[in-house]
Swiss-Prot record:
It is found in: Cytoplasm. Belongs to the RimM family. The PRC barrel domain binds ribosomal protein uS19. GO terms for molecular function: ribosome binding. Binds ribosomal protein uS19. GO terms for biological process: ribosomal small subunit biogenesis; rRNA processing. Pfam families: PRC_RimM (PF24986), RimM (PF01782). This is Ribosome maturation factor RimM. Signal peptide: none annotated.
């Protein structure tokens, strides 16, 4: 029996580019060009924990354009084919990623964690993470949505195995 590693979403195809099958990709990585480290991408719209629903695609050419990637994928040769990819997620297999340093996490590792503060107030689950100029921000949904900065003064403990996060954050914010 083959064990299949789960996929980690690294970006999203946002639009076709030109008439020769190029697509615009919005990366969800710290560095815009990080996706260039992976010559084979998985494309799909489904659950990344079920990679059999995704299709493998090889990158023929790619370049950075502002905060987007312009990419020519093998087998996508005209604008109509490129348009059919719009909205698809770009992922790579988890075991292809380098291990994060101590105290660092992939965003995909943070999504789904249950967040509580030091007073044991349950804030809900991390449903998204986004970058700002200064730091990353967690989107936590429970009884309401909270934006919690992902900085050392606020995030006190992350337990990816236990799926929990302890924060020093006022429940009124």
């Amino acid at each position: 029996m083959q064990i299949v590693s789960e996929l980690v979403i690294m970006g999203r195809i946002v639009a076709p580019y030109g008439v020769y099958g190029w697509v615009k990709v919005q990366p969800a990585t710290e560095y815009v060009d990080s996706l260039f480290d992976y010559g084979r991408w998985m494309l799909g719209r489904g659950d990344p924990k079920q990679p059999e629903q995704w299709q493998s695609c090889e990158v023929e050419k790619a370049k950075v354009h502002n905060d987007l990637l312009l990419v020519k994928l093998q087998g996508i040769d005209d604008r109509d084919q490129a348009f059919s990819c719009k909205g698809m997620y770009v992922a790579v297999y988890r075991d292809e990623l380098p291990e994060p340093e101590e105290g660092e996490y992939y965003w995909s590792d943070l999504i789904g964690l249950q967040v509580r503060n030091q007073q044991e107030v349950d804030f809900g689950q991390v449903v998204d993470v986004f970058a700002t100029g200064a730091n990353d921000v967690l989107v936590v949904k429970g009884d309401r949505e909270r934006l919690v900065p992902f900085i050392g003064q606020v995030v006190l403990e992350v337990d990816t195995d236990g799926k929990t996060m302890l924060v020093d954050w006022d429940p009124e914010f």
